[in-house]
């Protein structure tokens, strides 16, 4: 494989010295970029874009052509695993993802296969290999998956949800059925992420988008327990260097200590968590990623720079910070504002690394 020219993102995740704080953006390949919209139109629809390795590679690289980002993230979707399990994923205009065959019972869980990452999910591995080839060692490639709990919410609810009553009903009335589903998903995610690593992903991230809707006790039992199982089963070295793992529970700032005990390398923070407080609590154990409010990108350039400066000062001197948004970039953000953000992180962070 090609020698990595810029490894500051990987170094920061391992709390090693860097020259400036590395930065990337969740959903950096996305609808805020006109070139993304053009490629998506060419593909026909979202899943066709994910399943075409050349086009998935193209949209992965688009933000890197505009901005000096320190990492690329695989262009894919968290719902690839449930789709490969045969639930019939489709997208409804204005409604988001839906499944034709949601999981309603233990019998439904028992029928679900564990997908072979190189067969049913081979299109994802093809995309990883294509992107690695085209990156030519410029920056590392991040692979990812949804967490078992987050995937289960979509599979049981039949799509997106606001109140999560269907899955919570299963959790409280039929906990064995939900545990069986989460266990199957944990095995599937472990295989899926390890296949991404073997295909060339140099770091992986687990997105627990809906962990924050749980009580503390339920979070431990139904979300964190299964992410811990995945971390335990991951390949932690490939191509002669460590493959860092980042866990991100949106709305999970109160559980950072428990998350840091999983053996992951880094924790993602959303914008509701104070980064100085997070560093005091777990900074001696894990790196931190985050955590500007994505809506700040609607602000003026000076206001964006001020916010970047505030977050950098909050983290303070030294290593172990990857700058990011606290969640995905919004689709109607001006691309120039994203450029202001990336440039400000590099310029304003240099003094913190001297």
Swiss-Prot record:
Keywords: Cytoplasm, Decarboxylase, Lyase, Porphyrin biosynthesis. Substrate binds at residues 27-31, 77, 154, 209, 327. GO terms for biological process: protoporphyrinogen IX biosynthetic process from glutamate. It catalyses: uroporphyrinogen III + 4 H(+) = coproporphyrinogen III + 4 CO2. InterPro entries: UROD/MetE-like_sf, Uroporphyrinogen_deCO2ase_HemE, Uroporphyrinogen_deCOase. It is an enzyme of class 4 (lyase). It comes from the Bacteria. Its main location: cytoplasm. GO terms for molecular function: uroporphyrinogen decarboxylase activity. Catalyzes the decarboxylation of four acetate groups of uroporphyrinogen-III to yield coproporphyrinogen-III. Belongs to the uroporphyrinogen decarboxylase family. This is Uroporphyrinogen decarboxylase. It comes from Klebsiella pneumoniae subsp. pneumoniae (strain ATCC 700721 / MGH 78578). The lineage of its organism: Bacteria, Pseudomonadati, Pseudomonadota, Gammaproteobacteria, Enterobacterales.
